[in-house]
């Protein structure tokens, strides 16, 4: 995916989050110049647990049909070390008619809360 497409997707998602009163931490809007100035040690949990934005087409090339935009607020680390959390908190944006593939985690819990008002279809 081209950077321009990713930027457009993120802009649309930010607007959607704003409309639904979803507030993200300040680092959600850091430009690259600000990231480069950070003390990596002070921000190690953000880097280690890959907190922040994800835009994915799940290996395909049709984001509109099969894709997902999400912001990871909290995340557990493998086997609980060094960050002892068994859950993840992710704010996801799935567009109309967009599908996300099934997946599961052996050692992580996730709550799914539909705040956008769309139809959420879950297959168990």
What spans do the regions from the language model cover?
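A short, N-terminal "cap"/entry segment at the start of jelly-roll beta-barrel domains
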Residues: 1-88, 101
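Conserved hydrophobic/aromatic beta-strand scaffold that supports enzyme active sites
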Residues: 70, 91-93, 111
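Short secondary-structure capping micro-motifs at structural edges
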Residues: 76-78, 97-110
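Structural recognition of beta-strand segments within beta-rich domains
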Residues: 84, 92-95
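Short glycine/proline-enriched turns and hinge-like loops at secondary-structure junctions
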Residues: 84-86, 105-106, 114
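Glycine- and acidic-residue-biased ligand/ion/polar-headgroup-sensing regions
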Residues: 95-96, 108-110, 114-124
